């Protein structure tokens, strides 16, 4: 907070690409890995315990209201299973997603960032604004234009802010800003 991080902190890694989770095993004094996926008992047990503890910690520090459990570009079925685990741990957790638009899970997402080229239905965007939910768009390595690659015309970066304003969105996200083709 003292360094200006006071609006939102996104906490990732519930659904990593490899679905492999590293932990420290005190009994063997070594690092171990567990492979488990949303919908599996081990996944739920592990994450409910962690998120319950994390929720308590965030509340003690006064950070809970600015933290969101975040995911990116996962299939809707995976996100639905993950949302159930998050809600079981603490129904008040905010959830953030950068990915495709899915009407089925949209109401559960505090911060929803969809890929450029997709649109929020106007009534959804207006409702989200009334509910003080963040509604954004993003670009990543998929689309060559517009973007912010080293080969991109600088005007593209300026255009993206105008696009966000024209669509009445809360902002723009350059996903994986350090990942270039």
Over which residues does each language-model region extend?
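Aromatic-lined carbohydrate-binding surfaces of glycoside hydrolases
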Residues: 1-93, 98-106, 178-180
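Catalytic-core region of carbohydrate-active enzymes that cleave or remodel glycosidic bonds
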Residues: 111-180
